[in-house]
Each structure stands twice: as structure tokens, then as C-alpha cells.
Amino acid sequence: MPYERLKNARRVVVKVGSNVVTAHNSLNTNAIQSITYQICMLIDRGLEVLLVSSGALAAGLRRLGLDRRPDEIPQRQAIAAVGQSGLIKAYEAAFGGWNALLTWKVVPIINENDTVMVEEIKLGDNDNLSAMIALLMDADFLINLTDIDGLYTKDPRRWPDAELIPEVSVFKKEIETFASSIPGALGTGGMLSKIRAAKKVTSAGVPMIIAKGDKPDILIRLMDGEKHGTYFVPKSERMASRKCWIAYTLKPKGRLILDDGAVQALIHHGKSLLPIGIVDVEGEFDVGAAVEFADTAQEKLGIGLVNYTASDIRAIKGLKTLQIKERLGFKPYDEVIHRDNLVVTPP
């Protein structure tokens, strides 16, 4: 049974949404106390817990008397700065009450709403961040706590006939359609960003659960194997940390368009990418850059680290490996992307 796997977990990432830790124009200290208590109970069992907490931006908005998140980056930075200190202080105070259980233990508290790193706020959200942390830290599970019970067929806050989807094993288009109908409130995510996070971790072999954060002892009950929320089934094979890093943390600097033969070789046979299978090169990049590859219909298939510059790949595209030195005057590698540096990602 899927939930039984939680009993054997040794390291979990817990992501807590804005609507779980904020209420009535301020931080919800009762919710934070409950979450920290549960984390302490899990640590006392021998688990390692990494906490990704939203709430800084929402806490700042409410503290300043604002009811919507502005689009302008400087304003979002200022609001996050106002809320971040209060959020961390609240967690510090809550964890301080459980020192007997946390003797010399550390719970990393991670938040994407940084006041300095513009790109972090501009492009990221804590759902995506929690997925990256789960992959890079070799977590056994990602638990995403929000203000509804899981993924529904439509927004249950508006539609009484909405049905909970207890398990997702295949990401059909209708899954994103369901998620798109369930927006977030003050947070940056909403259900769609959670589904995208689930795609990432499950494709790398890590299961994820979306559950209601204010259910009594929800973390403890999940770790005891109880069924709650929506369970996202992982692929059976675990992706290596290095490939997770390539697939989900590096920004692509360009794109390679591949013919059908190369697509089949990479996706179905786990081969390296050779120049003969490349039909076009987009962008400018150097050796070692992360570059996407796609089919002739421009559908992204994956990402990898290139052994040649963009200009060199343009010169050798469509050629056999034996012709590389003849065209360039040198041949450090047979492959444009070696299979060890290549990751096929889900659509």
C-alpha cells in the first residue's frame, strides 16, 4: 500500500502553505505550534525533517494591511522583508518550547521569498522549492500541506460536488485542468504549482502527498500510514542526485532540435546524443552549459550538459562522429551530450 511506505521513511520534506500558517491578518501561531509539535514528535522517532514554509509574503501583506500581492518585484521584496522576520521568530518560539525533544537537533526552515535574490521571487515558489529540496537532499517523501484536503476535480471551496482524487499515478492533461481551477490566495502557488512540483519529484522516484494542514496531527497520522489527501505515485526507479540537479536546478541556455532517430535513441534506449541526430541549434552557449533538447514539433524532451559550444554544434550537426575532427579540427568527445549528463524529463 502506498501510504505504508511512510512508515519506513527516514528523511521527509514538509512544505507548509501560506493559508495554513496565516489567519485573521496575522500569523496563525496555533497552527505553527501544531506543526512544530508534530515535527518534534517525528524527530523523536528518529526522522530527519526539512521544513519549507510559506507565509513571509502573506504575513507581510497582512501586517501592512494589504489584501493582494503586487506584481512589482521591489514591492514584493519589501513585503517579504516585513513578514520574514515575524515568520522565523514564530517558528523559533514554537520550537523553543520543545527543546527537550530537539536536543542538539536542527530543523532547517527554508523560504523562497528572499528580500535580495530577485530571480528567486520572480521565477520561483515554495512548491517548486520544496520539490528541489526533496530531490537534492535525497528525501524519502515530500508532504505538501495546504488549506484543502488534496487535489479535487474542481475547487471544493466553491463547488460542493467537487470530488477528491485520492491517487495520481499518471499526469494526464485533465490533472492540470483540475488544478488550474483551484487557485491560491495570498501564496504564489495554488494547486497548479503543487501539481508541477509533484511531476518533478515523482519523475525522480520520490512520492508526494497533498493534505490539509489543519487536520489534527496530520503529519503524525500520515507517517503512521493513514490515508489522507492525494498521493502521487513515483516512478519505481530513483533518479540520481546529479541528474536531479541537472534536470531541475539548472536554467537552460539554449535548445537542440533532434530528428526522430535521435529522439528514439534518447528516450527509449538511454543513448548519448550524437551530432548526426541534431537538425537545429537555438541560442548561444559554451561548453558545459545546460541545454534543452526537443523534437521537430518543439516539444521539450529533456535537458543535458553539452560537450561543445553552440557554434561548434551548428558546424557538426547532422554529421557522423568520425567527421567531427575533419570539420572542427579537433574532437574532444564523440557525444554532444553524454548519457551520464542527460535527463529525459516528463512532458
Language-model features: locations:
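C-terminal catalytic "cap/lid" subdomain
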Residues: 1-69, 73-347
